[in-house]
Design a protein with these regions (language model features):
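Hydrophobic secretory-pathway targeting helix
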Residues: 1-33
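Long, solvent-exposed extracytoplasmic domains/loops
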Residues: 33-113
């Protein structure tokens, strides 16, 4: 029972770190937004809702390359303590500025997201330090005493358990409803923060970044994190065997 508890805690902690690594890696690629843009038919969404926007005009006249650039700037800003959010603007095909992209409420929300990333970074760095110390102790114990304080389970068993856990979580999301889970998470993470829900008619941000897009991004992050987790598990197992 003790070994199962230790193994579970270590696996979950390592996966949390891998989720952060996945976020950073995919941020560097802008989450392959050019592919997601096509998958979610965001151009059609912009054509439908941008003309209805009550705050900003003529976004429907912009090109897909402009939409992808704006997404990249948003990702860059929220990974940089929110710097530059207010300056994000959209331009017509001649390079003339039309307007700033974000409203004040949207900027506040994205700054809240940025603060969450900073807080998450601090947690992950602390967790990484703890895991290095724990695994270092296990290695030292094995080398100095020629026996195990804790021996890792096989990579196949560990992988199977993690995949099973992720399948259960996925099933839970489908039962509750992806949209409802999305809203619950926002209510928990941004309680007592600025506005986080925006109607299409009031927000170019929501028009460009519909809720369904974040579902795809969540899947990408999870798959990427699982790959990192498997690689790190193999390395750790080789060291501690």
């Amino acid at each position: 029972m003790k070994k199962i508890l230790i193994t579970s805690l270590l696996s979950v902690s390592l996966f949390v770190i891998c989720l952060f690594l996945a976020w950073k890696s995919l941020s560097a690629t802008n989450f392959f937004f050019e592919r997601l843009y096509q998958l979610h038919a965001i151009d059609e969404q912009i054509k439908k809702y941008a003309p209805q926007n009550r705050n900003k005009e003529n976004f429907e006249l912009t090109q897909s390359s402009e939409h992808q650039r704006i997404f990249g700037e948003i990702v860059s800003s929220i990974n940089s303590n929110g710097r530059g959010l207010a300056e994000i603007s959209y331009f017509n095909s001649f390079g003339d500025k039309i307007d700033e992209f974000l409203t004040n409420d949207e900027i506040t929300h994205l700054e809240d997201v940025s603060e969450l990333i900073v807080y998450s970074t601090q947690i992950v760095l602390s967790l990484t330090g703890v895991l290095i110390a724990v695994y270092g102790f296990f290695f030292y114990y094995k080398v100095s005493r020629s026996r195990y304080f804790w021996k890792p389970v096989t990579t196949l068993f560990s992988f199977s358990t993690m995949v099973f856990t992720l399948i259960l979580i996925t099933g839970f999301v489908f039962v509750i409803g992806a949209r409802k889970v999305f809203h619950i998470l926002h209510e928990l993470l941004f309680a007592d923060k600025g506005q986080w829900f925006f109607y299409y008619q009031d927000s170019l941000m929501t028009t460009l970044l519909p809720e369904s897009l974040f579902g795809s991004i969540a899947v990408m992050i999870t798959v990427c994190a699982l790959i990192y987790w498997v690689i790190l598990n193999i390395i750790i197992s080789k060291i501690l065997e």
